[in-house]
Amino acid sequence: MFATFSSSSQSRCWMFDSADALTAKRQAAHEAAVTKLANAEGDDAPPPPVPREDGELICAFYESKLQEVCKDENARDPKRFTNRVLYTAQSYFKRFYLNRSPMVEDPKGVMLASLYLAGKVEEERIVLADLVPKYAKLQEQALLAVELRLMEALRFQLVVRSPFRALTGLLHDLHAHVSAEGGAAGAPAPALAQLEALHPRAIDRVCTCLKADAPLMHPPQRLALAALLGAWDASDGGGAGAIDVRAWITRRFGGDAALDPAEPEPPSAEKLFEQLGAIDQLAPAHDVGAADVRERLKAVDSRLKPLIKHARKIEKAREERLAAAEEAKRDERRQAKGGERRADAHKILQQVEELRQEAHAAAAARLGAAGDTNAENAAAAGEQPFVVRKRRRNDDGAAAASEPAAAAVKSVKFEA
């Protein structure tokens, strides 16, 4: 059964009611980073923290950079770095910095790790060589470590519903509506031309709203509809064109129908247009292309670098402590196992010794019983028991001869 958006982790865990809720989460992450840097062990004093607004500015710059990377790479190979990867990667980036501060994790590394992870999730071939060292002076292992921290911050909730897919579905529905109005002749040529022109314009508007907080406050299908309506309103002719998008939205979604089937009370047409207009008016908080903003970005970046370096030092020390503690636990387990093995070996040796003594006693008992039986048999037959007699030896060690034998030796004569 197809799961609705409202039942997804994206809706349950990564959608917020207002911009104030997002600001509160970012402020909490900022304060946690300041505390972490201030309470670090060691003699080195931490660099002064940057304001939260400056951290948000540097994040906005790298969100814009992420879209540039996708567009440049997609121009070389249209099958890679598609809009699906763009939206998924930017969603990862936004979610990460809801719970982390750019003072403790370099946004450039997170941007590249988001793209690399999004390629896996969206099943597009993006390899490390596409990202490093082309876009950052990072070792591949360092980027893989950032990817792991990214997944941990995302709580491994990696499936992202994209407005680009919803936009394609809406355009197909609009095309069917226009064709039905044309009757047997089908959609008129001007309507088809306008539909074709609406698609790239709507995509651009989706990309623009991605730079704002809209993906964290509105479902993707509503983002797609707002982009389509905004593109139609901004197109030449607007409502005077061959297609009336507002009339189609009113007919399609203004009644009992809803963008999300699980929505309990679909909004009225008036309320829906109000929501779509608010989404379309959401703009990025910072114009990172402006000259004055560029200068501010350079200053913020120079202040962030020592903070990130200090945070890495803290993290490295923490990892070393954890590794040392884990090694101590392993040594303790090895020693405990060694003691158990020695105790088991001692117990086995004791058992072997007991068995040996029992076998020796049993053998002695059998020999004693056999000797007694032989003596009794000899006595019954009138025989002397067998006795071993030891011969005497002379001083030279030779056996002493009997007297008759000695006399016989003396009487031997040798004749010439």
PLM-predicted stretches and their roles:
Residues 210-225, 229-416:
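C-terminal region detector
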Residues 54-269:
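Structured all-alpha helical bundle cores of eukaryotic regulatory proteins
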Residues 1-109, 120-130, 144, 149, ...:
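Acidic, Ser/Thr/Pro-rich regulatory low-complexity segments at or just upstream of the first helical elements
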Residues 10, 27, 67, 90, ...:
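Residue-identity detector for glutamine
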